[in-house]
Amino acid sequence: MPACNLILALTLTAPLLAACIVLSILCLALLIRVSKDRAKLLQRGLLFRWPILSVDPGHISPALRTTELGPSLDSLVSITPSLGVRGGISDLESCILAALAKAASARELPGTQTHIFEFGTCTGKTTHHLALNAGHLARVVTLTLAPDQHTTYQRGKGDDPRDTHAALKESAFTRFYYSGTNVEPQITQLFGDSKALDITPHQALYDLIFVDGSHARSYVESDSRLAMHMLKPGGLILWHDYRGPWRARGVWSTLNALAQSHTLVHIKGTSLVVYTN
């Protein structure tokens, strides 16, 4: 009889125990998810601060400084909103890039050209912003894979396949957002794999370089190495998608490693990281 009672008790309590275990697992998963989302919002890890120091935009350029009345009028720029464009950057990031392009031109002597380079054209929307705000004397060079060049993509050992897929998916255009606009004559469109780029004509030429090509680690490393050689004294390099260890890990790991030998800063409220030569 006692054995029967024990079996009956186990039969009745087993579903309740299983439900409690499942509920505990779900609560733990929810807690981790909320903690991750909060960490992303604060731009820090679950238990640690991000390795690259976060600074206010005004730390990067006087054009991005604010007063109690609002942002500097030097940051007044022309952009079009993101509205879910493939591979796009946020409106705040667009404003910062556009303001830095404008500021780069303002630093040049009258009649002197400003030179800007972009790794990763995608739709050409950011390219348009850079050319439009840098002024009519600026020259923007932008590089992407053409749709018929996907076989030349050089996936590195250890690259995340998802980064490869995303890079090829965004290399789908031969006509761009800037095509047919009044800034198109200022833009030089290059097609090809960035790992094969001959930087001989680009050495120490550029005032501003935007690295937003493939986020696979081998490409971020290669593009960053090239950008360092292409940057002129006093110029800026900006990288996109420094979002913590959960997304774009190739960007995250490469920039954290680069920060060991170069002074990099992360712009608060964005996924942009900056290096000043």
PLM regions and their residue ranges:
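Long, hydrophobic or amphipathic alpha-helical segments
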Residues: 4, 8-45
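Hydrophobic transmembrane signal anchors and adjacent membrane-proximal interface regions, especially
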Residues: 4-8, 48, 52-55, 132, ...
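N-terminal topogenic membrane-targeting module
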Residues: 38-75
